[in-house]
């Protein structure tokens, strides 16, 4: 994963990323607050279920793609055996 490094200090990098996240997400929170105020308990439970279900699916996808990328890496043992044969 490519990570942008803003400064040499990891804590400052974390704060910059946190600030960028807050700036990006704040309009969504502000615009959706009216809808949140009118939400019933049933709606909240349904939303929690959807969020949890989405998280589980993303978790599974992450590990599937991690396994696929590991399979694409060349096997170091085979390259070592080839070097010994030569």
UniProtKB/Swiss-Prot annotation:
- State which residue ranges cross the membrane: 11-31, 45-65
Keywords carried by this UniProt record: Cell inner membrane, Cell membrane, Membrane, Plasmid, Transmembrane, Transmembrane helix
Report the Pfam families cross-referenced here: TrbE
Record localization: Cell inner membrane
* InterPro entries linked: T4SS_TrbE
* Record's bilayer topology term: Multi-pass membrane protein
Q: Can you list the GO cellular component terms from the UniProt entry?
A: plasma membrane
**What does this chain do?**
Not determined yet. Not required for conjugation transfer in rich, aerobic growth media.
Per its record, how is this protein called by name? Protein TrbE
In which organism is this protein found?
Escherichia coli (strain K12)
């Amino acid at each position: 994963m490519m990570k942008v490094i803003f400064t040499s200090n990891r804590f400052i990098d974390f704060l910059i990323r946190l600030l960028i996240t807050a700036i990006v997400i704040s309009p969504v929170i502000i615009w959706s607050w009216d809808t949140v105020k009118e939400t019933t308990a049933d709606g909240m439970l349904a939303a929690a279920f959807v969020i949890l279900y989405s998280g589980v699916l993303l978790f599974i996808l992450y590990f599937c793609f991690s396994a696929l990328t590991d399979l694409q890496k060349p096997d170091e043992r085979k390259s070592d055996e080839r070097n010994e044969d030569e």
